[in-house]
């Protein structure tokens, strides 16, 4: 029944099947009738679907625009806070660069070599002052009571500066020695080996030294070594050495 109704209703307006049943003259008249052609296009399903999609996109864009406008104050506040942070960062970077420059100047001024030069200058100044005080005392321009305390302070200061300069020089020498690279193995001199490690045993030992005076032989008979024929003899018993007796004088 539904199929029969659809067949009686005919094709949908704007569908290719509806234009296919029209004659050439009707199609020409339809092309010349723009309002009717526009109405046919608007009644087509494809156009209505595109219209619905357009309305949905417009509604979505409108919602996003409202949300963006609501977040705009927060964006402006964030930009202002970011600008403040950048300004603070710039000030911190400038302060850091200034402090680094002052630190480098201080390190150069108070380096060990500069401190050594300052100590040597102080030592020379203290010794020069002591010599001037001695000359004033010898010329009678200064009394002994005023000379002794000042001279003692000057000599103590000179001794302190000399000790500090010597200790600092020793420290600098140690640092320079530790900074020098270790010598390579190629520069090491060849090691000398003992003759016993190179020559054979007999050649290394050489002939035994003959004592000048031999002790008298023992009069006791030596017991024969025990052993079975065909078997090697066991270790020979060692005799304890007897104290050497002086030889009788020659007659």
UniProtKB/Swiss-Prot annotation:
Keyword annotations: Endosome, Membrane, Protein transport, Transport, Williams-Beuren syndrome
Membrane topology field: Peripheral membrane protein
Chief localization: membrane
Any Pfam family hit: Mod_r
Database matches in InterPro entries: Mod_r (IPR009851)
Boundaries of every VPS37 C-terminal domain copy: 93-182
GO CC terms in record: endosome membrane; ESCRT I complex; extracellular exosome; late endosome membrane
UniProt-annotated location(s): Late endosome membrane
GO biological process, one term: ubiquitin-dependent protein catabolic process via the multivesicular body sorting pathway
Segments for region (Disordered): 174-251
Domain of life: Eukaryota
Stated role: Component of the ESCRT-I complex, a regulator of vesicular trafficking process. Required for the sorting of endocytic ubiquitinated cargos into multivesicular bodies. May be involved in cell growth and differentiation.
Membership in a protein family: Belongs to the VPS37 family.
Subunit description: Component of the ESCRT-I complex (endosomal sorting complex required for transport I) which consists of TSG101, VPS28, a VPS37 protein (VPS37A to -D) and MVB12A or MVB12B in a 1:1:1:1 stoichiometry. Interacts with TSG101 and MVB12A. Component of the ESCRT-I complex (endosomal sorting complex required for transport I) which consists of TSG101, VPS28, a VPS37 protein (VPS37A to -D) and UBAP1 in a 1:1:1:1 stoichiometry.
UniProt-listed PANTHER family: VACUOLAR PROTEIN SORTING-ASSOCIATED PROTEIN 37, VACUOLAR PROTEIN SORTING-ASSOCIATED PROTEIN 37D
Pathology noted in the entry: VPS37D is located in the Williams-Beuren syndrome (WBS) critical region. WBS results from a hemizygous deletion of several genes on chromosome 7q11.23, thought to arise as a consequence of unequal crossing over between highly homologous low-copy repeat sequences flanking the deleted region.
Record protein name field: Vacuolar protein sorting-associated protein 37D
Native source organism of the sequence: Homo sapiens
Primary gene name: VPS37D
């Amino acid at each position: 029944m539904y199929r029969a109704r659809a067949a009686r209703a005919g094709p949908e307006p704007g569908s290719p099947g509806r234009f296919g049943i029209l004659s050439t003259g009707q199609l020409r008249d339809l092309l010349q009738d723009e309002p009717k052609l526009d109405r046919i296009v608007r009644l087509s399903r494809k156009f209505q679907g595109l219209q619905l999609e357009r309305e949905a996109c417009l509604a979505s864009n409108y919602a996003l625009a409202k949300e963006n406008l609501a977040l705009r104050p927060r964006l402006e506040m964030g930009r202002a806070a970011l600008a403040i942070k950048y300004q603070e960062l710039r000030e911190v970077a400038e302060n850091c660069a200034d402090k680094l420059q002052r630190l480098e100047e201080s390190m150069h001024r108070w380096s060990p070599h500069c401190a050594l030069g300052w100590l040597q200058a102080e030592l020379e100044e203290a010794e020069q002052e002591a010599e001037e005080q001695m000359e004033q005392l010898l010329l009678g321009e200064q009394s002994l009571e005023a000379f002794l305390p000042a001279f003692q302070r000057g000599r103590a200061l000179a001794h302190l500066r000399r000790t500090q300069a010597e200790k600092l020089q020793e420290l600098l020498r140690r640092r320079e020695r530790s900074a020098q690279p270790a010598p390579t193995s190629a520069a090491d001199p060849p090691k000398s080996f003992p003759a016993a490690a190179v020559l054979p045993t007999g050649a290394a030992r050489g002939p035994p030294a003959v004592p000048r005076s031999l002790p008298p032989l023992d009069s006791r008979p030596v017991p024969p070594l025990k052993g079975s024929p065909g078997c090697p003899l066991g270790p020979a018993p060692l005799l304890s050495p007897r104290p050497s007796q002086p030889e009788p004088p020659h007659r």
